[in-house]
């Protein structure tokens, strides 16, 4: 089974601190590396995390404020230096195309990697292929900002005792998957009677925003909701004026969405102890963690989920 985890490469907001780098988040999932909002210094954070940057296959930029994208150029150059042969898919708000180009071509280097751009100009499904369905929604921030929902496909799981009782084995199993029914010893066996559908897991990544319906829609039943919480409730006035959320607001949104786990991030440099965010949110949403750099948050596949 491929690893399924979120790795925090940085969790500070606008400026880094001695303890926190600007944000960057890596999901390793279904043999892909999904990198979200690589801030300044992301390339170096991979070294500290002991992860090869070559695992990255897709890069998502929520918006073009510097702390969410300044690491893009250096990451593309590093992947170029490492001579990766797989395509690097990049997703970003279409209105920020000129900023993407400036980051990508901001220095002199000979680009040999295959970068596939996906400028997003409308909400909904951006891409749907074998590994994932990628959805985007507009968030409520000062500039065009996208939140993301990534969902793996549903899979059919056989129920062993029912398969055995029906006398099914060997190549006929593939016939059953293809045709939805087979005949064995004069009996018609239907796929639905010997199997169940395991719903694919989803994750949600919520960057800078005020509380809004898009957050709830993106995070509905998500295994992990990675969500900004720039401020504590005592600074609610700052959250409102800068179009950010508090830990309490993030927890309220997670509860409304029915998310399974909430990971808070994007902490203002004014706070030295990020555990305060966990405590504030935990009063509303119990399964919450304040992001810690280089920590892994696994979400193993539950084979019995239906």
UniProtKB/Swiss-Prot annotation:
Binding site residues for Zn(2+) 1: 63, 65, 141, 208
Family matches, as Gene3D superfamilies: Ribonuclease Z/Hydroxyacylglutathione hydrolase-like
The keyword Membrane is annotated on this UniProt entry: no
Keywords assigned: Endonuclease, Hydrolase, Metal-binding, Nuclease, tRNA processing, Zinc
Residues annotated as catalytic: 67 (proton acceptor)
Class of this enzyme: hydrolase
InterPro entries per UniProt: Metallo-B-lactamas, RibonucZ/Hydroxyglut_hydro, RNase_Z/BN
Enzyme Commission number(s) of this protein: 3.1.26.11
Reactions performed catalytically: Endonucleolytic cleavage of RNA, removing extra 3' nucleotides from tRNA precursor, generating 3' termini of tRNAs. A 3'-hydroxy group is left at the tRNA terminus and a 5'-phosphoryl group is left at the trailer molecule
Function: Zinc phosphodiesterase, which displays some tRNA 3'-processing endonuclease activity. Probably involved in tRNA maturation, by removing a 3'-trailer from precursor tRNA.
Official protein name in the record: Ribonuclease Z
Protein's organism: Chlamydia caviae (strain ATCC VR-813 / DSM 19441 / 03DC25 / GPIC) (Chlamydophila caviae)
């Amino acid at each position: 089974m491929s690893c399924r985890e979120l790795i925090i490469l940085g969790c500070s907001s606008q400026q880094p601190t001695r303890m926190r780098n600007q944000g960057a988040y890596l999901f390793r999932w279904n043999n892909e590396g999904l990198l979200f909002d690589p801030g300044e210094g992301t390339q170096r954070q991979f070294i500290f995390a002991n992860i090869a940057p070559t695992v990255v296959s897709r890069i998502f930029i929520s918006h073009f404020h510097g702390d969410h994208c300044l690491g893009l150029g250096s990451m593309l150059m590093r992947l170029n230096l490492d001579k990766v042969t797989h395509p690097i898919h990049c997703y970003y708000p279409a209105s920020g195309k000129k900023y993407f180009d400036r980051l990508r071509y901001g220095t002199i280097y000979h680009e040999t990697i295959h970068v596939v751009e996906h400028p997003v100009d409308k909400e909904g499904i951006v891409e749907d292929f074998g590994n994932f369905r990628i959805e985007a929604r507009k968030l409520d921030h000062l500039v065009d900002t996208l939140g993301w929902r990534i969902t793996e496909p549903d899979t059919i799981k056989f129920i062993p005792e029912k398969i055995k009782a029906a006398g099914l084995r060997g190549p006929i199993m593939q016939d059953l998957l293809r045709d939805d029914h087979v005949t064995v010893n004069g009996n018609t066996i239907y796929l639905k009677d010997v199997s169940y559908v395991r719903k694919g897991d989803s994750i949600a990544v919520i960057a800078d925003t005020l509380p809004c319906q898009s957050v709830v829609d993106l995070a509905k039943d998500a295994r992990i909701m990675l969500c900004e919480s720039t401020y504590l409730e005592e600074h609610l006035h700052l959250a409102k004026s800068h179009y950010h959320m508090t830990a309490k607001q993030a927890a309220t949104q997670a509860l409304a969405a029915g998310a399974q786990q909430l990971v808070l991030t994007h902490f203002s440099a004014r706070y030295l102890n990020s555990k305060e965010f966990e405590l504030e949110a935990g009063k509303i949403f119990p399964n919450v963690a304040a992001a810690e750099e280089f920590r892994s948050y696994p979400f193993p596949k539950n084979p019995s989920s239906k």
